[in-house]
């Protein structure tokens, strides 16, 4: 699994003190990039992209908001959760295997890293239909894969710093 660091510029963010759950979302857009989401959320007056990760349709995973920062993805649940957004509109579309596989790998990695047992969809915590009725929750969240490897990092300033801190 490879996680690409986006190096997005954020405004001031609070540090999250605990990680108890993962909340899954869809972008409600058939096509979008990390930069699109960041711009949309800045235009909402937020610090930047509210999700911690974006999984693209081709299976590429992007790190958006730093993992240790409070998200802006699920009102009332941001202080103890990580948010993962999946490119697509799963009210209408059917997720393809590349995106399912990448999402499953990311969820399993984060569950192992943080000792998380709780994975939810946005509509479990807020009055919304996100991530849509076609979202393959069981295929992504309820996998019992073990031995998930640490993700490789694309070379870059943040990846280099993270590697040196590990």
Q: What residues fall within each predicted segment?
A:
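A short, structured beta-strand/loop element
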Residues: 69-72, 77-79
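Basic/polar, cationic surfaces and motifs that engage anionic cell-wall
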Residues: 1-23, 57-61, 66, 80, ...
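Secreted/periplasmic proteins that engage bacterial cell-wall peptidoglycan
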Residues: 14-68, 163
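Conserved PDZ fold ligand-binding element
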Residues: 166
């Amino acid at each position: 699994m490879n996680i690409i660091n986006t190096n997005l510029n954020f405004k001031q963010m609070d540090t999250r003190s605990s990680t108890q759950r993962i909340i899954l979302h869809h972008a409600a857009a058939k096509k979008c990039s990390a930069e699109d989401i960041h711009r949309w959320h800045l235009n909402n007056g937020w610090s930047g992209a509210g999700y911690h990760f974006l999984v693209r349709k081709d299976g590429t995973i992007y790190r958006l908001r730093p993992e240790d920062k409070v998200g802006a993805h699920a009102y009332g649940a941001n202080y103890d959760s990580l948010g993962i957004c999946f490119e697509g509109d799963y009210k209408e579309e059917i997720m393809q295997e590349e995106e399912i596989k990448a999402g499953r790998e990311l969820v399993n990695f984060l569950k192992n890293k943080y000792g998380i047992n709780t994975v939810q969809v946005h509509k479990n915590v807020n009055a919304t239909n996100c991530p849509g009725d076609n979202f393959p929750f069981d295929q992504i969240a309820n996998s019992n894969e073990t031995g998930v490897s640490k993700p490789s990092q694309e070379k870059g300033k943040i990846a280099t710093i993270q590697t040196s801190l590990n």
